[in-house]
Every structure is written in C-alpha cells, then in structure tokens.
Amino acid sequence: MIVIHSVAQMQQYARERRGDIALVPTMGYLHEGHASLMVEARKRAKYVVASIFVNPTQFGINEDLDSYPRDLEHDKEIAAKAGVDVIFAPTAADMYPDRYQSYLNVEEITVHLCGASRPGHFRGVTTVVAKLFNIVAPKVAFFGKKDFQQLAVIRRMVRDFNFDIEIVGMPIVREKDGLAMSSRNTKLSPAEREKALCLSRSIAAAKAAFRGGERSVAALQKVAAAVIEAENSPLIDYLEFRDQDSLLPLDKADERTLLALAVRVGSVRLIDNSILGED
C-alpha cells in the first residue's frame, strides 16, 4: 500500500489504471464501518483507493473541523488490513488552491434533515466528492448508509451530472450495544457514550410500534422521541419519517419508510437511521 498526497500524482496513478479503480471516500479516523466498505471494494475492482480528507467546505461556523479526530498512522493500519492499494490524503491547499471559486450544489433533497441545521454542508460534500471522482476516476464508489441523506445526494449528483460511476451503499456497522459506528464516537465521555444509545433504542422502539400495527407517522415520532427525551440531556436536532427515495415527509408509514434522526449528546452531534421494514 502506498500513500499519495499530491493531486497530480493521484491523477497520474489513476490514468495508468483507468477503468478498474474502486474509491472509498472518507474523512479518516477509520473504524470497522469504513473497513467494511474497503473489503467490499476489494471484491469489485483491481485497485482500491481510500481517500482521507477532512473537507473544510462541509463544516459550518462553530462546527468541529478543528477538533475532528485525525490519525493517519492508525488509518494506514486499518486500510492495509482491508486490502487498500492507495491512501489518497491530499492537503486542503491542494484541493482548494488560492482563489478557488467553483462549487457544486444539489437542490431540494439537501435543504431538509441535516441540510436544515447545517447550511452549506451538502454543497461542500458534493463539491469534494465530485473533485475526488475527477481525480481518482473510479468505476465504482462506496458510501455507508449511516449518512443516508449524503448517499441520496451523491446518487442524485451522479445521475444529474452523468458521472459514469456505480454508487454502492453499504449497511450501517454497529457496536455490540447498537451504537452506529462513527469517528465522532471517540469524542464522547463514558457517560455521554451511554446516553448515545438512545439513538438506536429510539429506532428499535419505533420499529416495534410499526410491527405492532402503528402506521401514523405522528404517533411513531412520539414513540421514538420519548426514548430520547427520557435521557434528559440529549437534544433532538431532527427525528423524521421520510420516503427513502425522495426524502419527502410522510403522514403514513410503510415498510420502505426511512426513520432518520440527529441527536446532540453533549457537544457531539450523532446521526442514525433505519428502514422500518428491515431488521
């Protein structure tokens, strides 16, 4: 495995291997969830590139850009074990050179859920992912379903801009106690870590009510919110039941309905989701 920092060098590597590269875009501080994407990518292409870049344009004012965990040596170990050929770890100056002025924006599906409380976030996401697609030229790219809205946005961007790239969404990987794996989990104190379990428990409660016959979204929201509110300190950013394709709100739930939530535990904002009809 090699590490490439230069955009020009990454482009040269890609030109020599065009047509058989799988890309796993990440912000680093890798965990088993990231590794699952890399292992699957290994099955789908001759060469696997994992990008590690904490993208400044997707962080807003007073968000955790400076404190976002970083550990390239740790990341190299995980990537190598997962079968990655190249870590592409560019600098912000290389990705966004002086007087950078070009951004890509996907409308409508970016304005609600995470987009409502993080204005500009998805503009940064789509811009950096489009740049990575152009630099690495993959035939397939892997994203985790924990960031369900992000996955939907990327798929829309790929369709609308005619990127000849297959987008693969991979299942959420969870800790043994149900907490969705996230690089931000490391920022939780032990007490906060325990409180954070309310996200997966609220999903479980809503799904149990759904299996019991409840179809009213308003009623299901009350069931899920009650689990989080019982913990006192976690603050709900959003708790929504949406159509999984359009991400539009619903009044009645069915087996394809997406339950998506974002909750702030202490200073850490966590997200999770599940499809009601799936285990």
UniProtKB/Swiss-Prot annotation:
E.C. no: 6.3.2.1
GO molecular function: ATP binding; pantoate-beta-alanine ligase activity
This protein's UniProt keywords: ATP-binding, Cytoplasm, Ligase, Nucleotide-binding, Pantothenate biosynthesis
Enzyme class: ligase
Binding, beta-alanine: 58
The protein's assembly and partners: Homodimer.
Record protein name field: Pantothenate synthetase
Gene source species: Geobacter sp. (strain M21)
